[in-house]
Design a protein with these regions (language model features):
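Structural signature of the histidine kinase catalytic ATP-binding subdomain
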Residues: 10, 31-34, 70
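Conserved beta-strand-loop-beta-strand hairpin that lines the nucleotide-binding pocket
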Residues: 1-5, 51-155
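STAS-typified acidic loop motif
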Residues: 5-17
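Conserved short strand/loop->alpha-helix "switch" segment adjacent to the catalytic nucleotide/phosphoryl-transfer site
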Residues: 20-44, 48, 102-104
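Heptad-repeat coiled-coil signal-transmission/dimerization helices
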Residues: 15, 19-22, 113
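Alpha-helical macromolecular-interaction surfaces
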Residues: 17, 38-41, 74, 115
């Protein structure tokens, strides 16, 4: 299994480092461009939510740790932050059937992540949020293997 990790300051300016890290990992593992793009979308949504809603303005000097793992057909993403407790698996996403004007703002990023992964686990350990995601390469995102759909409602 190939593995790599990075620790970032919880600041928007660090996103370029995260992009370069993920892009390099994807190329090293030989992921096709569409899968590399999906990985970048997942990390963009998680990072932006953590920095914007979970850490700032509550915690100055927060950190975000990202670990990636690859074994043929399976991409693992671990995202850890020291922000406010937040379980995205328990978060009720937006009602996409509702008219745009009626729908509240927010929640689409979590919905996007849910649609791109096959397995997810969350836990709060100490003062940190731990989110573990698995994306199976070669299996369409919306086809959840029996018994593996997280929380009955996606990520």
């Amino acid at each position: 299994m190939k593995r790599a990790s990075i620790t970032l300051r919880a600041e928007h300016a660090e996103f370029t480092r995260l992009q370069a890290f993920a892009d390099g990992f994807a190329h090293q593992c030989g992921l096709p461009d569409d899968e590399r793009s999906r990985l970048l979308i997942i990390l963009d949504e998680l990072f932006t939510n953590a920095v914007t809603h979970g850490l700032w303005p509550y915690s100055a000097g927060g950190t975000i740790a990202v670990a990636l793992g690859w074994r043929t057909g399976r991409l693992r993403i671990t995202f850890v932050d020291d922000g406010q407790p937040f379980d995205p698996l328990a978060f009720r996403g937006p009602d996409l059937e509702e008219a745009t004007e009626e729908r509240g703002i927010g929640g689409l990023g979590i919905h996007i992540v849910r649609s791109l992964v096959h397995q997810a686990r969350y836990r709060r350990e100490g003062d940190r949020n731990h989110l573990h995601l698995v994306r199976r390469i070669g299996l369409p995102s919306r086809e959840w293997p029996s018994g593996e759909r997280p929380g009955g409602a996606g990520v």
